[in-house]
């Protein structure tokens, strides 16, 4: 925020290098006013981000956190731990930039049907992968 930017300026900071893709957590107006340049990594490992999202999806659909906590306490029962198969389910991808495209391709590898929404659709890419762009309302309605 502006207070932090001003403290940095008082300490002769001229540049803030962000280890992320976006600027959403920096007061750009305050930084500009203080003469501090902001730089970022615009392609911050889109594969790692998409793969991490898939790992979280798998952990949740397979109840891995719950299974881990149970086994830690010596409880090896399977009740309530039966997971769901991703194969045959529909995945809705909101935004088909680099991360969204990689995520869609990874999930398609599990046999999921992929539907997409983006203000600026990449229809050529979607057609290549047999993915379908749908209106935003439909993305949230599909099961």
Where are these regions (language model features)?
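Phosphate/diphosphate ligand-binding glycine-rich loop within oxidoreductases
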Residues: 1-68, 83
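Alpha-helix boundary recognition
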Residues: 9, 32, 72, 87, ...
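Residue-level detector of flexible, active-site-proximal loop/helix-junction positions
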Residues: 23, 45, 71, 121, ...
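Generic structural signal for helix capping and beta-alpha/helix-loop junctions
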Residues: 25-26, 48, 74, 101, ...
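Conserved hydrophobic/aromatic pocket- or pore-lining residues that grip, position, or stack substrates
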Residues: 31, 53, 74, 95, ...
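Generic structural signal for alpha-helix termini and adjacent loop/cap motifs
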Residues: 60-63, 74, 142
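A short, charged, Gly/Pro-tolerant segment at domain boundaries
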Residues: 70-78
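Rossmann-like dinucleotide/phosphate-binding beta-alpha-beta segment
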Residues: 79-143
């Amino acid at each position: 925020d502006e207070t932090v930017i001003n403290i940095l300026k008082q300490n002769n900071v001229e540049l803030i290098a962000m280890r992320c893709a976006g600027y959403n957590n920096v007061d750009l107006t305050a930084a500009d006013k203080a003469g501090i340049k902001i730089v970022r990594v615009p392609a911050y490992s889109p594969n790692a981000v998409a793969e991490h999202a898939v790992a979280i999806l798998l952990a949740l659909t397979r109840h891995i956190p719950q299974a881990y906590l149970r086994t830690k306490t010596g409880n090896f029962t399977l009740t309530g731990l039966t997971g769901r198969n991703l194969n045959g389910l529909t995945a809705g991808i909101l935004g088909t930039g680099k991360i969204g495209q990689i995520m869609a391709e990874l999930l398609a590898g599990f046999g999921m049907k992929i539907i997409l929404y983006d203000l600026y659709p990449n229809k050529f890419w979607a057609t290549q992968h047999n993915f379908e762009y749908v209106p935003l309302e439909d993305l949230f309605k599909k099961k």
